[in-house]
Amino acid sequence: MISARQMTSLLSSTVITLLTISIGHTAIAATEPASTERGAGGYVFASHDTEGFNTRGVAVEYLPELRNIDSLTGMRYTYRTYTQQNWQREAHQVSLLKRDIDPATANGWQLDAGMSLQGSHGMLTLDGGYHRPLAAKTGLDLFVDREWVETHAALDRGVHFIFAGVSVDQGLGDHWTVVGLAGRQDFSDGNSRDHYRAKVVFQPLLDSGLTLQLRYRTYHSDTNNVGGVYFNPANYAETLLAVGWRKRIQGWVLRMTGGMGVQQINSDASTNTHLLEVMLDSPSRGTQFVRVRGGYSRSASYGGPNYGYTYLQGEWIIRL
């Protein structure tokens, strides 16, 4: 249960969010055609891992501006539960949503900013991204994420992080693309990580939707011991071979990625990793929009090298 003080803080955030939306809506309405529609939606999330940690989330959304699922303004209230054996924790979050992304090119930006309360801890949350072309075959991505560290011990202590970085993608001819990413993750307990990732994508047949991918990621932590509060090796690296497939069916877009790789933690012997992801998006035009994501990964945690994580999430939006 949340305290009266926390509820007051949550309600204050709700009022501020509504005022921000109202002001922004009024300003935009004065400069844009009156054809902008309103909408409402919902969001669900569920995850489970092999250490018995479960996350469940349900959200409702009000959208005073709605063009499609990638172009909207609104607010969201989210209720989450975290459970592990006999332990349980509730979290409440109010967020301002803004998306302005071209579904044909993925150019644009999105922002989810708000406040989350769990246990006796409160935090301002942030999830944002920006993509723009730098040249005909060159793209730039900026991203930032501020969120709780989702383990039993970390939630009890209110540990959170902010992860920000930049990536660049470069097309090489018609069949090849290379991507590089660099980011920094700062934790509220004083720990920090430097992240580096690279990806090479080969498209053998341009109209098939099939891609072959080589992925590499590594991070380095400056604090070796965080007391088992979360998985934190000094050095981690993974190399993964993946196959991706994208198919458009009557406006619906289906994406699937599957891969296998190897990981190394510090100087330990390498072990196997697995990845499977499925994504489904409804047409960008219509009276309602659906977006579904699901996946499974097998990598490492402080419990050992065979940590498994499964998740499923979905968003449904309708015009009013």
Kindly give the residue locations of the regions a language model identified.
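Short, intrinsically disordered, low-complexity terminal/loop segments
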Residues: 1-2, 320
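Bacterial N-terminal signal peptides
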Residues: 12-22
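Bacterial N-terminal signal peptides that target proteins for export
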Residues: 2-14
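Transmembrane helix recognition focused on a "late"/terminal membrane span
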Residues: 3, 23, 27-28
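Gram-negative and organellar
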Residues: 28-320
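Intrinsic low-complexity, intrinsically disordered segments enriched in polar/basic residues
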Residues: 8-9, 21, 100
